[in-house]
Amino acid sequence: MRSRILKLEIVVFASLFSLLISNCNMKDDSKNQITITINSVDKETKQRRVNKFDTVVVRKEGIGYLMKTFDKVGQYVTDSTGSVKIRIDSSKICDISVSGLNVLGGDMYNPGYLKDGQEVNIEVISIENR
């Protein structure tokens, strides 16, 4: 009888210990979240693309064995000032691409490069002029 209780205590202790370990390994994404402002800028004139309403696609590094994969986090549309404010996870590689009517541009940022409240200028180039 005593050995059965001892075995039960060991099983319960091992279960609680493994549960505690698994919860400690889970990342809290809320502390890695930062807010950035993305500006769509014309490469030739170096001015913001005002009233163009470009599409901004944000992707973050995913799981990949031989090649990196980039999972789509969100798709946003710039406002009349040519910018959009978003929240992203700063602990992963971030790929930001901007596309609009006959324009395309993008950039990739490593972890730790983007800071909270930072403005990011993405230069877009006209596809017709290429």
Language-model features and meaning:
Residues 21-35:
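Bacterial Sec signal peptide processing site at the extreme N-terminus
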Residues 34-43:
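A short, amphipathic beta-strand motif
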Residues 79-95:
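Short Pro-Gly-centered beta-turn/loop motif in secreted/extracellular proteins
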